[in-house]
């Protein structure tokens, strides 16, 4: 969000994050946004304070965000807790659990699972009529037959993080 005005001012090209996209979409009256995964709390955030601006923006911008969870490279346990702390609704569409982006599900339960699109739509209409601030995350997992095994992904991420530390690779 903070770099959006800088890009406009300098008339340069830029890409958008979830936070800047929902900020722009909301200002244009768009109510729905679909993305692969949201940002979240990074591993070792207790030392680095590296938490995606997506979470803060989700807490204050009214948007219905459909996604397959938070990106797998993140600390999904801390991300789940931070979503709850910020009061962001974690809704499942035909799933009882928050998906893990590339894999079908984590062990984190959603606030509610809607099986029928009609029931989900009714919930969203009620929420909109009450003018409750903040976004609703609607988790729609990758199909089971297209998902990657959770243990494989976690192993790859762990190896990559260790390699980055060993090579002193850091970044924004």
What are these regions (language model features)?
Residues 14, 32-37, 43, 65-67, ...:
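General beta-strand structural signal in soluble alpha/beta enzymes
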Residues 135-172:
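A C-terminal functional module that forms or caps the active site or interfaces directly
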Residues 78-85, 102, 106-109, 152-159:
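Short, solvent-exposed amphipathic alpha-helical segments in soluble enzyme
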Residues 17-18, 46-59, 63-84, 117-122:
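Active-site glycine-rich loop that binds ribose-phosphate moieties when present
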Residues 24-27, 32-34, 50, 55-60, ...:
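Solvent-exposed alpha-helices and their adjacent loops that cap or buttress functional pockets
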Residues 1-31:
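Ligand-binding beta-strand-loop-alpha-helix segment within the catalytic cores
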């Amino acid at each position: 969000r903070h770099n959006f005005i800088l890009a406009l001012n300098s008339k340069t090209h830029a890409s958008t994050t979830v936070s800047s996209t929902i900020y722009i979409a909301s200002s244009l009256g768009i109510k729905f946004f679909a993305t692969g995964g949201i940002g979240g709390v990074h591993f070792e955030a207790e030392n680095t304070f590296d938490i995606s601006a997506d979470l803060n923006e989700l807490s204050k911008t009214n948007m219905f965000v459909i996604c397959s969870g938070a990106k797998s490279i993140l600390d999904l346990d801390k991300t789940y807790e931070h979503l709850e702390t910020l009061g962001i609704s974690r809704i499942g569409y035909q799933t009882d659990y928050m998906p893990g982006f590339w894999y079908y599900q984590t062990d984190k339960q959603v606030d509610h699972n809607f099986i029928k699109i009609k029931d989900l739509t009714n919930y969203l209409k009620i929420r909109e009529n009450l003018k409750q601030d903040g976004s609703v995350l609607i988790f729609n997992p990758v199909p089971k037959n297209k998902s990657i095994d959770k243990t494989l992904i976690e192993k790859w991420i762990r190896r990559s993080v260790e390699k980055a530390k060993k090579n002193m690779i850091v970044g924004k």
